[in-house]
From Swiss-Prot:
Belongs to the universal ribosomal protein uL4 family. Residues 42-94 are annotated as: Disordered. Keywords: Ribonucleoprotein, Ribosomal protein, RNA-binding, rRNA-binding. Transmembrane segments: none annotated. Part of the 50S ribosomal subunit. It comes from the Bacteria. Gene3D superfamilies: 3.40.1370.10. This is Large ribosomal subunit protein uL4. One of its GO terms (biological process) is translation. One of its GO terms (molecular function) is structural constituent of ribosome. Residues 64-77 have a biased composition (Basic residues). GO terms for cellular component: ribonucleoprotein complex; ribosome.
Length: 206
């Protein structure tokens, strides 16, 4: 698969041949769903907690005698049906993380890259670098490239000026190549890779 390399100014900078094993797969939604679910589960804090009937600060003694009142039979006022009682089956502190094999994670990343390539939402940029940390200039360059909602992946190190300028633009994310992940790829409309990022990805999956 051949793609044209462009500069931030929108000029042609040659062509690059992409590895079909990384960018040319037929995307599988089930694999992408598994990886996204795994990522989001790892992010979930899991510190939610509601007081059950054993946690409520209230007497545990019987409310009133069993017989002779004409009222319903009850024991403790900690029961869930009473105001101030404990919650029934409420959330508890737990870890939402679950296992996903490394091979499935790697396959998910390749399928996400292939999905963007298949949808023509993959752009290769010569270099993600800026002489000045000027957001206005970068917005103008992105407009020429049609980037309104995009994830930009640079090399191992992101140019400081480019990072600073891009951080002020809504719906634009910038990550080094080691931070690339399925969820961020899929949540943005366009995927922009630098030449260095393409080389690093092909080396990673070699």
């Amino acid at each position: 698969m051949d793609l044209t390399i462009t500069t931030l100014e929108g000029k042609d900078a040659g062509k690059v041949k992409l590895n079909e094993e990384i960018f040319g797969l037929d995307p599988r939604d089930d694999i992408l769903q598994r990886v996204v679910r795994w990522q989001l589960a790892r992010r979930q804090q899991g510190s939610h907690k509601a007081q059950g009937r054993g946690d409520v600060s209230r007497t545990g003694s019987k409310m009133y005698k069993q017989k002779g009142t004409g009222r319903a039979r009850h024991h403790s006022a900690r029961a869930p049906q009473f105001r101030g009682g404990g919650q029934a089956h409420g959330p508890v502190v737990r870890n939402h993380d679950h296992d996903l094999p490394k091979k499935v994670r790697a396959l998910g990343l390749r399928h996400a890259l292939s999905a963007k390539a298949k949808a023509s939402d993959l752009i290769i940029i010569d270099d993600l670098a800026s002489a000045d940390a000027k957001t206005k200039q970068l917005v103008s360059q992105f407009a020429k490239l049609g980037l309104e909602n995009a994830l930009l992946i640079g090399g191992a190190e992101i140019d400081a000026n480019f990072q600073r300028a891009a951080s002020n633009i809504p719906n634009i994310d910038v990550l080094p190549v080691q931070g690339i992940n399925v969820y961020d790829i899929l949540r943005r409309g366009k995927l922009v890779l630098s030449k260095a990022a393409v080389e690093a990805l092909e080396e990673r999956f070699k």
